[in-house]
Design a protein with these regions (language model features):
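Extended, alpha-helix-rich binding/interface surfaces that flank or overlap catalytic cores
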Residues: 1-205
């Protein structure tokens, strides 16, 4: 959804509940088109889910860089999400406080956390994908605080199916992203063990 200019962003925030749902580091050679002027973003990008205030079934999306994202968050009061950065040499940064912020980190189930990182890396790999994509549904389910301490059996099956439809294994994705990128290590041994114990066929490697 086009969002260039502060005044337009203010009007959009009157019409939509504009909530950030992800913030991702772009790797070498990858770009995302900004909705604030159709320019290529080359560093990091933020995804917003925009829900109509008059029809909650109507969703739009905004993909933008940090400057525009900070402006939207100042208007709405939401927090800028933590940056997902899969690289070794930079540290993830956090947003400022606001709606949706918390003072303490939730205690993740370790299998769920590994699967969550897998999902974030898939989104990083795919880039400019629609927010109604199944992978975003899985992301929302995994980060739901009501279930964050539980094993993600359903979501594991969903990720497996998603990878099959991509015709990629998670190992393939890691190998592709390692080209020209100092990618940090992403473990998924706990997910594999859980799948084996529950007789779930895997498409991770």
């Amino acid at each position: 959804m086009y969002c260039r200019g502060h005044e337009l962003r203010k009007k959009l925030c009157e019409q939509y509940d504009i909530k950030p749902i992800g913030r991702f580091k772009l790797l070498n050679g990858r770009t995302v088109i900004s909705d604030a002027g159709n320019m290529d973003i080359t560093d990091e990008y933020i995804i917003f889910d925009c829900i109509s205030k008059t029809d909650h079934n109507h969703h739009e999306s905004i993909y933008c860089g940090k400057y525009v994202a900070e402006d939207l968050c100042k208007i709405t009061g939401y927090s800028l999400p933590q940056l997902f950065n899969p690289l070794h040499y930079e540290h993830s940064s956090h947003g400022y406080g606001g709606k949706g912020s918390t003072n303490s980190s939730p205690k993740w189930n370790p299998v769920r956390k590994q699967l969550y990182d897998i999902v974030l890396l898939i989104i990083t790999y795919q880039g400019n994908i629609k927010i109604n994509s199944k992978i975003f549904d899985i992301k929302r389910e995994l980060e739901d605080p009501k279930y964050i301490e539980y094993y993600p059996k359903l979501q594991i099956r969903s990720v497996n199916t998603y990878l099959i439809k991509m015709n990629k294994t998670f190992e393939n994705i890691i190998a592709d992203l390692q080209n020209n990128n100092n990618l940090r290590t992403f473990k998924y041994d706990l997910v594999l063990d859980y799948m084996e114990k529950n007789n779930i066929s895997q498409h991770l490697k």
